[in-house]
Structure formats: C-alpha cells, structure tokens
Amino acid sequence: MNIRRALIGMLSAVVAAALLLGVTFLDVNLTSDVEPDLSYRTLDYDVMVLKNGDLKVTQHIDMKLNDRGFDWKQMYQQYTLKANNLTNISDVSVKDVTNNETYVQGRFVNPNDVTDWNAEYAGQWYIADVSVLRDPQPFNPETDGLKADSSSDKTLEIGWNIPETASADSLKFDVSMTMHGVSTAYDDVVSFQWEPFGTTNQIPIGKVAGKVTFPDGVTKKNSWAWLHTLSLIHISE
C-alpha cells in the first residue's frame, strides 16, 4: 500500500513516558532529593516522521556530571531492536555543542583498556551490538538490522567518547539517528508506538520537551495521538 497516503489517512501513537505527538510541545519536570552522578538537565526531542514511516530523531541533551572519584570518558544509550517496532538504526551522528565539535565514527572500546584516552578515542562515537553481555560486536546498519519476520531481538548501544572529565556543570550534545521499522501499515491507517525512554532508564531528567512533525497532508483533523505515562510528573502543552 502507499505509505504516504496511509500516513495522511491517520497516524496514531502510544507513547510511554514523556512525549506528545504533533506539532505542539510537551514539557515534563521531574524532581529528586538525591544528587546523582549523572543527570540530564534537559532532554529535547526533535522528531520527523518520514514519508516511508521511519523516524528521524534528534536529541538535544544538556547533561550534568558530578565528581565520582574517577574521570568520565564514555556516554551511551541502549536500544532494543524488535521485528514489530524497531528493526534498525542508521544515520547516527553526534555533535559536542558545548565545544562545537562534530564527533567521527569509531568503534567500541573499553576505557579501562586505553592508556591515552584523549589522544586515541576522545571525539569518536560508536554503534555496537551488545546483545551478549560483556561481548560487544560491531554493528553495520546496512547488513545487521532485523528482518520483518525475525524472531530474535538485538540490543544496540550508541555511545560517544568525551575527553577525560572529572565533573561538568553542563555539557551539551546533539545525538541524531534514523529509526527504521517503527510503523505498521494497515489497509487504511499507519500507526506507530514510540517510547522515548523506557522503564529501565536510571538517569534522572530535569525537563523533557518533544516536538514531532509529520509529512505534508497530516493535520490535527486526520491524525490521533495518545500519551501514556506512569510517572508522577507535570505535563503542559
């Protein structure tokens, strides 16, 4: 069927945690009495639904790093590939907004195994298959994504190597990627379910904002969106 025509017919979304789909914004404020080692001051999502149903996602992250007794070197996020809602991740890019530096692609490496971190690996990002604990493997989006009929899942890690840092009150990064296989096409509609961050997330986030744009022809009158959350949070449009 024509994906673009179906998208115009209807786009529905069930979002777990903190995102309102559409062209409006949603703000979430979370508070905690415990000062964590790592926290996100803000997390802003810019999401574009492509004509083929894929999602182009950019995260604008402002993080705080407290002194934990040893340097920070590697930041990362993990994603689960499933045949029914996320089959691949490609087009990854990472920019250090604070220092106006675009990171280059590298490979996963354990910081504990590196003598001169700043000279050898700082300023690089990586994507790895971490499905097997303690055995990260290279991941190539062109060949290693899931097929639509796959019965097995994969866990991907997208990470970026920062210069050795004892602490930082504010570090800003833009992390972008394209998520494939997130939409389901029916006879007259296309739907997708997206979870910006899951129930296993352990990083406190001070404020989350999300903006989603759709292809031309999708309007408030021919699309629907739902927000689901179990968090005790303040939500505003």
Descriptions of predicted regions:
Residues 2-232, 236:
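Lumenal/extracellular ectodomains and adaptor appendage modules
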